[in-house]
Regions:
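Terminal, regulation- and interaction-focused segments at domain boundaries
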Residues: 26-56, 153-156
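Compact, glycine-rich, soluble single-domain proteins
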Residues: 52-105, 109
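Extracytoplasmic/secreted envelope proteins and their assembly/folding machinery
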Residues: 41-44, 48, 65, 144-148
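Bacterial N-terminal signal peptides that target proteins for export
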Residues: 1-11
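Solvent-exposed, acidic/flexible segments
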Residues: 36-44, 61, 133-140
Length: 156
């Protein structure tokens, strides 16, 4: 129990320290889009390495362009990374079961028609508003800081 409290306190402290890194502005649609400084595979590798280094559970990597190719459809490179911290993410779901539509965290890595690689995710403040969750501000702030830290490994 003491170790759990220590880890929780450490994660909160880390998130608050890194909050300025996660201060990316969401578009009106609630999507944060950031340019990657790297190619597609290096972006994916760097993100996955940072997720693992932070001790965050990695659930899945879905190569959407491969799925499209298997269906005979051409799609620019697009990969969805799914990860999260169940003790944190489930707190959002306990506030509103519909929040399960937005958890675990999904981070999209895609290449546009000019060859620029992007990372995109749903803004956590937008998720809170979408689900009317008003009693988890500390947790949303922490999640924002963590995703900002993760994406900072591929942005300049």
């Amino acid at each position: 129990m003491l170790a759990h409290r220590f880890c929780s306190a450490l994660l909160i402290s880390l998130a608050l320290l890194l909050l300025p890194l996660g201060a990316a502005k969401a578009a009106a649609d609630g999507i944060v889009r950031l340019k990657s400084a790297y190619g597609m595979q290096e972006t994916i590798d760097r993100l996955k390495e940072d997720i693992a280094a932070k001790g965050i559970k990695f659930f899945s990597e879905i190569d959407q362009s491969k799925l499209a190719a298997d269906a005979g459809i051409e799609l620019a490179p697009s990969t969805l990374l799914i990860f999260g911290n169940p003790p944190l993410g489930t707190l959002f779901i306990t506030a509103d079961p519909d929040a399960g539509l937005d958890w675990p965290v999904r981070l999209l890595v895609f290449q546009d028609d000019k060859g620029q690689v992007w990372v995109a995710y749903t803004d956590f403040a937008w998720i809170a508003k979408r689900h009317g969750i008003t009693n988890r501000d500390k947790e949303f702030t922490m999640a924002t800081g963590v995703i900002g830290s993760i994406t900072s490994v591929v942005t300049k």
